[in-house]
């Protein structure tokens, strides 16, 4: 009887132990799940990139290489460079793989471009630049052209493609090299543009490329000249915008007082470009006089210079024209002097200069103010005298009113006088001859009268003595 009871005891004990084990395992699992959150699992995709010949490499999103994978890239320190005109620029570009001549070919190109991709913000410039090259693509460097270099330190230059090869310092040819720096010695209109580093596989397939955009600028110099004018003539001024870059980067406007001047009616423009590529623009305004204006207006030249598409600077200069009354000048000969009379001249700042046969004489003149100009307030009349030349012959005596600003016509007058003795004695001789002829004529008249009177008396018979 004891054997069946033993079997029952063992079975019950087994069940109790099994239940305890399951309960413990369940509690441990629940405790673990509460104290440590489960970490979600992400699947990292593989990104396929451009490869060299015979490469099946891939790079995942975390930047780590998968088995048998490698990304081939070209990296430059800067992608946009903007510097002042004539400044040097260093561009440092590297490849992620060594450029072995048997596997790769690296080339550097220059795409000559203007800085404005769309419509230029400035005015159109009417000039012809015979020295400029059109927008084109130039090959500067190629690892496949190692034997065409002609100058030490200038390796890789493709001959006859650039006007001056010394514009650049090019990379050295190194088997398996990864560094391909390029230096522009002086940035100007020839060297501004987009520089492209391109890596090709042996079969000519483009592996990768990158670009660096280089732009340059030069701020303009603004000069305004307000021209003097005579009363009743147009107001004139000239604005010179010199040595600026880029092309079509200046917007110019004229203002009379605060009102903008009609560009098509009253403004003329001319532009020129120098061999260095800098532009100079000359703008001239000529505005008719408004008789209703009481005062002379102010003329202002204002420019907006765009260094690039997003930034600009405004520069302006203004001035008021000086208006003068044209004087009346006349020269005459009086009492052995040449006399110059100038009417309606400024009371200060002007004077008379003489010339004899276009030469300045050494004889001083005597200048004096003779009164005020009745038709123009603030102006005076003046007179200058100088002795006539004692030399024989014909002389031109010119009187010039000096002191007026440049831009006005010359105010002068000229008289011709001959001081030869024959010419000087001719009036006396003429007088003597006239008196003599007059006296002779008078004597002849008296004689004729006497003869006539004598002949008109009646004749009488002779008397005889016996008649007495």
Curated annotation (Swiss-Prot):
It holds the Pfam family Marek_A. Residues 1-30 form the signal peptide. Coiled coil: none annotated. Residues 220-311, 321-416 form the Ig-like domain. This is Envelope glycoprotein C. Belongs to the herpesviridae glycoprotein C family. One of its GO terms (cellular component) is virion membrane. Residues 31-431 are virion surface. Interacts with host complement component C3; this interaction inhibits host immune response by disregulating complement cascade. Disulfide bonds join 76-93, 239-301, 340-399, 344-373. Residues 31-73 are annotated as: Disordered. The chain crosses the membrane at residues 432-451. Essential for the initial attachment to heparan sulfate moieties of the host cell surface proteoglycans. Also plays a role in host immune evasion by inhibiting the host complement cascade activation. It is a single-pass membrane protein. It is found in: Virion membrane. Residues 452-468 are cytoplasmic. The keyword Electron transport does not apply. Keywords: Disulfide bond, Glycoprotein, Host-virus interaction, Immunoglobulin domain, Inhibition of host complement factors by virus, Membrane, Repeat, Signal, Transmembrane, Transmembrane helix, Viral attachment to host adhesion receptor, Viral attachment to host cell, Viral immunoevasion, Virion, Virus entry into host cell. InterPro entries: GA_GC, Ig-like_dom, Ig-like_dom_sf. The lineage of its organism: Viruses, Duplodnaviria, Heunggongvirae, Peploviricota, Herviviricetes. GO terms for biological process: adhesion receptor-mediated virion attachment to host cell; symbiont entry into host cell; symbiont-mediated suppression of host complement activation. Its main location: virion. Glycans are attached at residues 46, 57, 62, 92, 100, 131, 203, 208, 269.
């Amino acid at each position: 009887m004891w054997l069946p009871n033993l079997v029952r005891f063992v079975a019950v004990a087994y069940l109790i132990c099994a239940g305890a084990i399951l309960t413990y395992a369940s509690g441990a699992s629940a405790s673990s799940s509460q104290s440590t959150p489960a970490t979600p699992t992400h699947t990292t995709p593989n990104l396929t990139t451009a490869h060299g010949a015979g490469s099946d490499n891939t790079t995942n999103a975390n930047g780590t290489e998968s088995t048998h994978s490698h990304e081939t890239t070209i990296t430059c320190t800067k992608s946009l460079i903007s510097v002042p005109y004539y400044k040097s620029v260093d561009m440092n570009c590297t490849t992620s793989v060594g450029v072995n001549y048997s596997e790769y070919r690296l080339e550097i190109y220059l795409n000559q471009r203007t800085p404005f991709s769309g419509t230029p913000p400035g005015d159109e410039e009417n000039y012809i630049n015979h020295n400029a090259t059109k927008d084109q693509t130039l090959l500067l460097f190629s690892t496949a052209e190692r034997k065409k270099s002609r100058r030490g330190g200038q390796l890789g230059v493709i001959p006859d493609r650039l006007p001056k090869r010394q514009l650049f310092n090019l990379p050295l040819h190194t088997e398996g090299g990864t560094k391909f720096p390029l230096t522009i010695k002086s940035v100007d209109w020839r060297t501004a543009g987009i520089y492209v580093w391109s890596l090709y596989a042996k079969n000519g397939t483009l592996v990768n490329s990158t670009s660096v955009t280089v732009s340059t600028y030069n701020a303009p110099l603004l000069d305004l000249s307000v021209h003097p004018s005579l009363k009743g003539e147009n107001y004139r001024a000239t604005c010179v915008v010199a040595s600026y870059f880029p092309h079509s980067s200046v917007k110019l406007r004229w203002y009379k007082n605060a009102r903008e001047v009609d560009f098509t009616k009253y403004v003329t423009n001319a532009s020129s470009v120098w061999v260095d590529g800098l532009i100079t623009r000359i703008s001239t305004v000529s505005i008719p006089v408004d008789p209703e204006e009481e005062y002379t207006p102010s003329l202002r030249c204002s420019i907006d210079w765009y260094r690039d598409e997003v930034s600009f600077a405004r520069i302006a200069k203004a001035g008021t024209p000086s208006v003068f009354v044209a004087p009346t000048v006349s020269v005459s000969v009086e009492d052995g002097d040449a006399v110059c009379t100038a009417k309606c001249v400024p009371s200060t700042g002007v004077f008379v200069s003489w010339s004899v046969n276009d030469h300045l004489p050494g004889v001083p003149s005597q200048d004096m103010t003779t009164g005020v100009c009745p038709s123009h307030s603030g102006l005076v009349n003046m007179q200058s005298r100088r002795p006539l030349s004692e030399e024989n012959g014909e002389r031109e005596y010119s009187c010039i009113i000096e002191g007026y600003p440049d831009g006005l016509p010359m105010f002068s007058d000229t008289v011709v006088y001959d001081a030869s003795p024959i010419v000087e004695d001719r009036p006396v001789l003429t007088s003597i001859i006239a008196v003599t002829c007059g006296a002779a004529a008078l004597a002849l008249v008296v004689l004729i009268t006497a003869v006539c009177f004598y002949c008109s008396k009646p004749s009488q018979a002779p008397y005889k003595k016996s008649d007495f």
